[in-house]
Amino acid sequence: MKHLKLGLVQTGDPLKLCTDQYNAFCDAMKDVLGVELIQSEWEINGAEDAERIATAFEARAVDLTVLMCCSLVGDGRVIQPFIRSHQEVVVWCLPEPTREGPLLLNSMTCANLYTSSATQMSRETGGKRAKWIYGLVEDPLMMPRLLSSIRAIRARKSMQGATLVQVGKTAEGFINLGFDAEAIHDKSGVNVVFCSLEEIFRDMNAVSDADATALAGTIAC
């Protein structure tokens, strides 16, 4: 199992209204096998903070950054350094009281601003976008949605440097099965090579029965 580094950073929370959820998230991550939680030393209160934190996370080889929207801070530039980095980004939006309690902190507005900015940047970042999650840590869908991203990133890390072989051609007309091998390599580090059936049969026939039997004995099923 590949080790994964998860960075956690929050926007400014001067009234400490998000402290309980922040701590609950940290506690929940302790139970996720193979994940190292890296907490930012600073909150985000503007684009300069975001740049500094994204750089610090990049220096520590963070794979996934969770940006906790405690309040509406800055503008769309806040998310840009994270999107330009090698980190994947999840924007976490928290529910707020609708009938009573403290003044709204515009968490959803903040999340919408950041994810929209990331989407606008997708052309210059090879299609990279930010994923959003909504809810409290104890909600039934919040953590599973995040964990699906963690599993996907871990799978991609495990596949880096691997070689996939497509044997034979894609049947004519199945244009939906076409892909760009170079783009796959650039995005995931996976090499794709193509081999015809004729090449497979030729190489099979060139192997002696003794060598084939010896090789079969080394393959674990």
Language-model features: where?
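An N-terminal assembly and electron-transfer interface module characteristic of large anaerobic redox
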Residues: 1-221
